[in-house]
Amino acid sequence: MYQLRHKKFVATDLETCWDFFSSPSNLKKITPSYMGFHVKNEIPEKMYEGLMIEYTVTPLLNIPMNWITEITKIDYLSYFVDEQRKGPYKIWHHEHHFKKVEGGVEMEDILSYVLPLGFLGNIAHALFVKSKVREIFEFRNKKVEEIFK
């Protein structure tokens, strides 16, 4: 299993930060356009445990992939977890943590994932998946800074 941990300071209050990140409609705003992110089902303004979000993405070679994510756990103003139910990964478990700190919010993402195809998945991870995942987080960092200026 691979794991990526990423911390980010956001210069806003905890409630504003939580409201932005817990609204599924904002995911597209912090996803690179080349990913072709498109939500396929109706989504509420605010997430809830058990919420299923179906979307397509084109992360590699412009090949569309269907992905279904479930919001499996929410602790209001503290963290939420999304897990892939259908998609390109064998396992995808993404924790989003929020902590009030002086001057704003410290966000921490903890992403744990496993690729399919055994050793071929490990090769793909080394060749491009790891760098692509990091690139997406770097893009999100920049967008979050723009949004919360």
For each predicted feature, which ranges?
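Hydrophobic ligand-binding cavity/cleft-lining segments
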Residues: 1-48
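Short, surface-exposed coil-to-beta transition loops
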Residues: 3-5, 64-68, 91-94
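Generic structural detector for well-ordered beta-strands
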Residues: 5-11, 38, 56, 70, ...
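Beta-strand elements of well-folded, non-transmembrane domains
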Residues: 10-12, 57-61, 73, 88, ...
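A short, structured loop/turn motif at beta-sheet edges
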Residues: 13-14, 46, 72-79, 97-106
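Hydrophobic pocket/interface hotspot
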Residues: 16-21, 27, 53-55, 71, ...
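Glycine-rich portal/gate segments that line the openings of hydrophobic small-molecule binding cavities
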Residues: 39-86, 139-147
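Beta-strand/loop substructures that line and gate deep hydrophobic ligand-binding cavities in soluble
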Residues: 84-135
